[in-house]
Amino acid sequence: MKVGVTGASGYVGKKVVKELQNNSHEVFKFVRRSVKNEHEIYWSPSKQEIDIEKFEELDAIIHLAGESIAPKDLLGFLPFAGGRWSKERKSRIYWSRKWASDLFVSTFESAGNFPKIFITASGNDIYGDQGDKVVT
């Protein structure tokens, strides 16, 4: 299966890419810079640009891209992440997801052929055992 992954360079994305490759899927990474090889697909959510021809070749998309919600010091291995939840940071988080969602919606609407599987995760966190408490 040809699978496109956004956020492929992130903590979760790297693990997803490795697992897909270990299971013999052909992985295409969405990148916001010039592509370096045939397994990269250019996209720019903020500019609403995407390589539609490569997009149309995919069987599935796993969308993991977005501003990190992780604390800056999360176990010391996410130095790029986090900080206080200021208005500016909340805005970055919101727009990183909004622009990508808008781009995918418009691309799905205009594509002659499009992936039949679309999986998205916009953020995750660790809450620990909360017993019977509902966590949202």
Summary of predicted features, one role per range:
Residues K2, E26-V27, K116-I117:
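Residues at the starts of beta-strands that form the adenosine-phosphate
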